[in-house]
Each structure stands twice: as structure tokens, then as C-alpha cells.
């Protein structure tokens, strides 16, 4: 467990960890290429290593012993039939992307599963989409969750329709699978898209590895994606940028506390949706300094509550919830039904756990209404095996009066293995027992 005492001041320079989203996509694209790629500055986390393991099961050769550079020999656009069940641990991204890719094995079946949390995550929308393409993919339990069984087979149809307001990972999986088709093909969105920046990341990484995706808009709304057939993944030397989601906890701590911190490896031109945290804290009243590749914060700042649409930034919800507790007035988080489909129901978890600390939060179907109380009290916090809750609640504990105990700190291995060391390095009053 993590034990946190109120922290009076934070000071220093930290480097944002490499992006989890970019690392996943880059290593899987490299694993399909017709040559040798390098992934430079990858995120060496449990989730991303699940993608390494899964890609190797499908025929890639990957040397991940150097934590600063992974060397990937691709399977030459020909995934191999795995010789065992593909266990992807706790990585939903890996499960969803490789479910599509696994359909391109030459014979037999691929079975994909994971830990006790992963086998509860919804998969049916992706399975239905793959079935539309003529691919046989189904839940072994017939309930739309892993274990997932995928049969080898060519893509027979060239149009797939899928909701845009569920998980963008389903669409990412289709984008990375459909270039194997002999035909030009189309992904049509049947509902407005949420988490669009994650698809921009997918398209950006695919482009670097030689695969092109065209976006089509109707009345300024994204409605479909067009994917040319017979495309081939090409090798590439890919450098992973910093993770804005992980940086958000340091940004929150910086604006709330007496601080003088610099966060490196966060780029102004990033396609990551979670870079929106910079705009959010500015709108709330924190004039933080942005440079080309870093953020400088000299807090504390007096924040005011605002309304925040989290359609494209679901991973920021726990961070925003903490900020709202200390802002003057009301902070409303809305358009976040999909936040309930993450590692846990994050809307429920934030409302329930922060209330223990004295927060005034009303849970809504699509978000949270947070009345700024200006003060929290230490409490014992459950984190539901969710890495983002561990990190957000740590910031809450640093601001709270008294002692805060956070359970399940091992979850940070998913996205930010050295989180505790990093936040201690700038002055957080934390011990681990």
C-alpha cells in the first residue's frame, strides 16, 4: 500500500514517461513489417510488454532487453498461427488489436485471453464487426468477453459498420487489420465518434509504417474511414513521445500545490487527446507555461469550476475530478458514458472514493458534478486495480489533511512503473509498505 501525508511543496524536473498508446501501436505495426524496426524510448510497462508478448506469439522476433530501444523483426505481413493460447495479461489494447490481426494467420485458430479483469471487458462490438468482414471470431463463453477464439480467414467483405461511441480500440483493431484485405474497404460509423484522438494516434503510427487511412467527413463530422487494399507494413525507426495522460497527475499537483516544477517530453504538436489537460487547467485559472517540449508550473493557482466535455479524453476524468474538488464553484464532467468501460467504472469509483475524503460529488449517467470543497481529509482508498485511480488519488492524498492510504499500487506497472519514485523525487511525502 501507499501511505501519503500532506505535502507542502513540490519542486524539480521530471520526464514524462513514454506514451502507452504510441508504444502499443508502434510495436504491433513493427511486428507486421517486412524487415527490422526499432522502437526508441518505448514504455517498458506491463501493458506494453503484453503487446510485445502477443506480437511474438504471432511470429515476430522482438528483443526488448534494452529498455531504451526495442528491436523488432517483423513477420513479413504474415502473422503466424500461435502455438499456445495468447495471454495478454491486463492489456485491453493488446487484446482488441490482436483479435483483429489474429484473423490473418494462415491456418487454424488463435485463442486470446487475459487476467481476471480483462475477461470482463466488452468485446462483442469488435467481434460483430469482424463477422461483418467474413471473419469468424467469437467469445468462448458466448457472452462477448474473453477468451476470444479467432479462425484464420480472408477478409471477404469490404464494408463494416460500427458504433463510434463505444471503445475506439475496436476501430483501431479494424484499421490495423483491414489493410490485409485484397479490396479497398470502408469503416462506417453508425454513431458520433468518441475518443477520436486515439484514432488520430493510430492513423499517425500506421502512416509511419507504410499504411494509409483516409478520413471522410460529412458536414464537418467524421463519418467513415477508407482503407486501400493490399497494403504492406514497412519497417521504421520509431521514437515514442511522452505520455500526456501520465503527465496530467504532475500537472494537477503543480497547479494545486506550492510548486516549481518542469515536466519534459510533452510536445505542443502532440496528437494525444490528453494533452487537453493543459487547456483545461488554463481555463480553470492556472497560467502554466508551455514550451515546445515541456511544461513549467509555479503554483499554487486559484482554480474555478468549469464544464468539461470528456468525449475525447476519458483517461483524464480522475485527474479532473481531483482538480474539481479544489476549484471554486462547480465542475461538471459530461459526455463520458464510455468512462465506465475502462479498467473499472471510473465514474463510480471517483464518486465513491473521493466522497470518503470529504468531496461533494454527484454521479450522473455520463459524468460527475463536483462541488468545490477546497479541502480533503485523508482516507483509505480502493483503486479497483486501476492504474489511473492510483495516480490520481495519490495527488488527492498529497493535498489532504492527515494520512491517506491507497491500496493496489502495483496497478501503476500498467502505464507508469516508476510513478512513486518520480513523484517522490519532486517532494511528495510518500512511503510504501
From Swiss-Prot:
Phosphoenolpyruvate binds at residues 20, 92, 121, 169, 346, 388. It is found in: Cytoplasm. It catalyses: 3-phosphoshikimate + phosphoenolpyruvate = 5-O-(1-carboxyvinyl)-3-phosphoshikimate + phosphate. 3-phosphoshikimate binds at residues 20-21, 25, 167-169, 195, 315, 342. GO terms for biological process: amino acid biosynthetic process; aromatic amino acid family biosynthetic process; chorismate biosynthetic process. Keywords: Amino-acid biosynthesis, Aromatic amino acid biosynthesis, Cytoplasm, Transferase. NCBIfam families: aroA. Belongs to the EPSP synthase family. Monomer. Catalyzes the transfer of the enolpyruvyl moiety of phosphoenolpyruvate (PEP) to the 5-hydroxyl of shikimate-3-phosphate (S3P) to produce enolpyruvyl shikimate-3-phosphate and inorganic phosphate. PANTHER family: AROM/DEHYDROQUINATE SYNTHASE (PTHR21090), PENTAFUNCTIONAL AROM POLYPEPTIDE (PTHR21090:SF5). This is 3-phosphoshikimate 1-carboxyvinyltransferase. It comes from Methanococcus aeolicus (strain ATCC BAA-1280 / DSM 17508 / OCM 812 / Nankai-3).
